[in-house]
């Protein structure tokens, strides 16, 4: 047999001991099976060190070393010492950047949905070779590289990630490690990575790791729920399932409901809102099924009464949630954003500001639940235009003309869309270029916040505890890292809810030009997050050169501060035309990650 030398296959195929097709940049065998290709990097060479200490040198060589040392000492008497402090390892820099800006600032257990807030405390207790440690190190280094060097590098093969995958499979097969909370959390980290990969490549995210985490929680639920961390993870899984059920118009899955005590762990206002979200998902599925039945057979008005009553009861629960939420969570209305260069982009010149983007995201979820209910009501009213006022009275407590009820519902949709649009200036500010490490120190980026002098009414700020408000530096770091993600979620929802079978009922409720503005803002957030490369012959966005070490950017922008670059909002519709299918896939991947 001819010896062709060492295998040239990818690291994943080598570990699995299967033949690799050696495709570049990733092999097709891995891609077809939904595996992460480990790439073709050679393992580090084994180094052999030769002793070079004084006792190991030859006598003649020792004399030469002594002469050089004495000479260096004499010359150093007249010159300052040179600092040779070693730079931190790349992994340490990456963890500090990711945990600090994405999982630290602006997050807390009071508003937590149970994922990002757990990472740093859990990592502190983990050994270096645990699945969670390896997964976080791999994810963090990919995120840091994307910000430092190449905004389109996230989906390139990564050897560290392939090693972490192998370690997770070992942990799941081990009876003791599979019961560990850190193993479940590691699976969620891998799912978060899968979601980011899908978003950046505009593809549909797979649920493999999420379903695995659900299976582990169901298998060891009672044990895992005995700790606060375990209960937080259950809430996170519940939120992701609610979002997926609403997007896919299906009921909340019984597989998640089988997790013990899920309904008895509200914990905080965001978790209480998620419990209402279960009812929203179920009634949406019920209305959709009802509309499909109407197309096949006539139904009686009494079949409609319980559905209208259910819609109204859920809406009352949503209004009660708003009235009982922390006062510190209430948004502050700003009638006019301040002037900057480039300008802060807003729909009608106004915006809302929040304590942080995580709380703004929770309010966006609340508004999206209301939109789902309003849309369901319009579907029923449109399907049964001759419904009697008596049926409406049963559901709403008073007789109403059907046309008046429909007009009131459309007005509520318009007001809710306006509120969701007011989130965008808070999250996006005046950003018009692809995000890079330079943005963390850039002085030309501006965001409406409670730190802006004259922006907020001082009496309105009194409802926010000052000891819980972020410093200006922490707020800017937090919103530059996560703001575009939290704008992307409501923007993709608003477009998606207008694109499906009954989307015209919602779109007809909006004022002219509003959907076009939403499309442009979605395109701007896509540009900032580098989800697509610029179109041919388009202007070049501000990029950063490879940075130095931890925390120092070492960047040189290719544009002057304030220049428009690739992010000229007037060009976004041309550069980034997204189909309804792409918007729906984007929304699905975002929701599977918990909205980032």
Regions from the PLM with identified roles:
Residues 82-100, 104-319, 323, 327-361, ...:
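Intrinsically disordered, low-complexity acidic/Ser/Thr-rich segments used as protein-protein interaction/activation
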Residues 28, 134, 184, 369, ...:
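Residue-level detector of short, conserved catalytic/binding motifs and their immediate flanks
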Residues 1-130, 157, 557, 574-595:
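Charge-rich, intrinsically disordered regulatory segments
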Residues 34, 38-41, 172, 221, ...:
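Eukaryotic basic, amphipathic alpha-helical target segments in cytosolic regions
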């Amino acid at each position: 047999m001819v010896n062709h030398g060492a295998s040239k296959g990818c690291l994943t195929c080598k570990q699995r001991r299967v033949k690799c097709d050696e495709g570049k940049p990733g092999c097709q065998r891995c891609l077809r099976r939904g595996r992460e290709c480990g790439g073709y990097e050679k393992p580090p060479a084994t180094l052999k060190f030769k002793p070079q200490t004084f006792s190991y040198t030859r006598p003649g060589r020792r004399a030469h070393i002594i002469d050089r040392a004495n000479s260096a000492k004499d010359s150093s008497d007249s010159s300052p010492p040179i600092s040779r402090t070693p730079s931190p390892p790349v992994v340490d820099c990456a963890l500090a950047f990711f945990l600090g800006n994405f999982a630290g600032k602006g997050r807390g257990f009071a508003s937590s949905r149970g994922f990002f807030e757990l990472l740093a405390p859990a990592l502190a207790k983990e050994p270096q070779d645990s699945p969670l440690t390896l997964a976080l190190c791999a994810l963090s280094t990919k995120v840091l590289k994307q910000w430092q060097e190449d905004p389109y590098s996230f989906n390139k093969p990564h050897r560290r990630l392939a090693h972490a995958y192998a370690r997770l499979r070992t942990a799941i097969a081990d009876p003791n490690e599979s019961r560990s909370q850190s193993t479940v959390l590691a699976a969620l980290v891998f799912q978060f990575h899968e979601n980011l990969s899908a978003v950046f490549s505009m593809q549909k995210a797979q649920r493999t790791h999420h379903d695995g985490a659900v299976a582990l929680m169901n298998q060891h639920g009672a044990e895992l729920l005995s700790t606060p961390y375990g209960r937080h993870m259950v809430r996170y899984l519940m939120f992701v399932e609610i979002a997926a059920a609403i997007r896919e118009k299906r009921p909340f899955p019984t597989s998640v409901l089988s997790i013990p005590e899920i309904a008895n762990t509200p914990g905080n206002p965001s978790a209480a809102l998620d419990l209402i979200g279960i009812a929203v998902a179920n009634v949406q599925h019920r209305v959709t099924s009802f509309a499909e039945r109407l197309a096949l057979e006539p139904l009686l008005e009494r079949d409609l009464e319980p559905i209208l009553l259910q819609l109204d009861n859920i809406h009352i629960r949503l209004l009660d949630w708003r009235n009982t939420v922390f006062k510190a969570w209430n948004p502050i209305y700003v009638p006019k954003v301040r002037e900057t260069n480039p300008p802060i982009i807003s729909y009608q010149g106004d915006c809302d500001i929040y304590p942080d983007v995580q709380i703004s995201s929770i309010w966006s979820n609340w508004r999206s639940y209301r939109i789902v209910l309003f849309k369901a009501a319009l579907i029923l009213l449109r399907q049964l235009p001759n419904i009697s006022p008596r049926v409406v009275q049963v559901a709403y407590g008073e007789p109403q003309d059907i046309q008046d009820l429909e007009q009131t519902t459309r007005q509520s949709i318009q007001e809710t869309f306006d509120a969701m649009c007011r989130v965008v200036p808070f999250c996006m500010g005046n950003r018009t270029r692809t995000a890079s490490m330079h943005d963390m120190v850039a002085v030309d980026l501006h965001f409406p916040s409670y730190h802006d002098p004259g922006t907020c009414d001082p009496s309105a700020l009194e409802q926010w505890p000052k000891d819980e408000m972020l410093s200006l530096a922490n707020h800017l770091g937090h919103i530059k890292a996560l703001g575009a993600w939290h704008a992307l979620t409501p923007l993709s929802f608003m477009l998606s809810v207008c694109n499906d079978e009954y989307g015209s009922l919602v779109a007809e409720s909006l004022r002219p030009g509003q959907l076009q503005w939403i499309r442009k803002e979605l395109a701007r957030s896509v540009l900032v997050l580098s989800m697509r490369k610029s179109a041919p012959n388009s202007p070049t966005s501000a990029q950063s050169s490879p940075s130095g070490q931890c925390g120092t950017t070492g960047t040189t922008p290719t544009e002057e501060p304030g220049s428009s670059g690739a992010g000229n909002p007037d060009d976004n519709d041309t550069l980034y035309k997204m189909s309804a299918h792409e918007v729906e896939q984007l929304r699905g991947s975002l929701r599977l990650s918990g909205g980032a």
